[in-house]
């Protein structure tokens, strides 16, 4: 294994060994405390632009499942078509793996996808640094390459300045019905022609426009198994002239302030006060911005399978899967909106709802993948409104 160094923005250095693809990369260094789920996390588009640190000490011992596509066009075991994280950082990588569904090692997968992996890092110490300082930019440099670079002069683009949503969103309109192969349509298709085509796909199903900010596969699956037709559109596509029954705003990476086009489209959709709207993760933030609230960056974010949230107005507490670095400022919610969920660890917002209209959202991931599915009922609540 080749020597490799993780260099943080504050000058901190962590030395380890490479077990993935060997190339220098830069990104925002974050940590995830989940014990399992690295195939799902690595393929989650919300990790785009980030160096993902796993705090669980042993990683790789159950290998990687096959990349297979179901008849409905969805990946069976992954959350997208490829790895989106810039790199993975672990304490102890297991070269040996054993699982009934594994087809290759984590190292082989990383090399094939050209994604670096570091092992031998003191991830507890790294996590403490990020916890005290907050997440920061960092770079992975390989042995002799490090000596060729003046790291004091190393410049890395700020994570919040890049529109990662634009990088991971679909570039066409994709229509899913749940069983058949999806229909792919160019975004240049005239609205009248598009509505005509959509009306012939399956007129018996309710139609949901899904704004793809970096949607996870299991979100699509959770909608489709509730017998709705999903019209997946790019993040900045103006869908307001389409004929549909509900609006879904997906998860996604980066700073929501880079997605003003999506916010403006949501505001136009909100002119129809009877239109059901549901957002998850980035969708919660964009819906909040459309409603007039402000967003702020968390010190080190929520990335784990065990985040407790309470439904406001009740004593019901749910354990949720989370992956976000930004949150809605509850104090900026206008009088028509109120918090729906609150994080029991730090009191931050975990969802909002409108007091009169059928609009609500969750900052956590009710679809899980991976993690607990305690809150998947939110998809049922949305479909009931259609």
Which residue ranges define each predicted feature?
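RNA-binding accessory domains that recognize and position tRNA/RNA substrates
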Residues: 1-199, 203-228, 232-236, 256, ...
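Residue-level detector of beta-strand face positions
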Residues: 5, 308-310, 351
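Active-site-proximal beta-strand elements of phosphoester/diester hydrolases
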Residues: 207-212, 320-321, 360-364
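Short acidic/histidine-rich motifs immediately flanking catalytic phosphotransfer sites
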Residues: 242-249
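Cysteine-nucleophile active-site neighborhood
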Residues: 251-330, 371-381
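Catalytic beta-strand/loop cores that center a nucleophilic Ser/Cys/Thr
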Residues: 315-357
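A glycine-centered loop/beta-turn motif at secondary-structure junctions
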Residues: 351-386
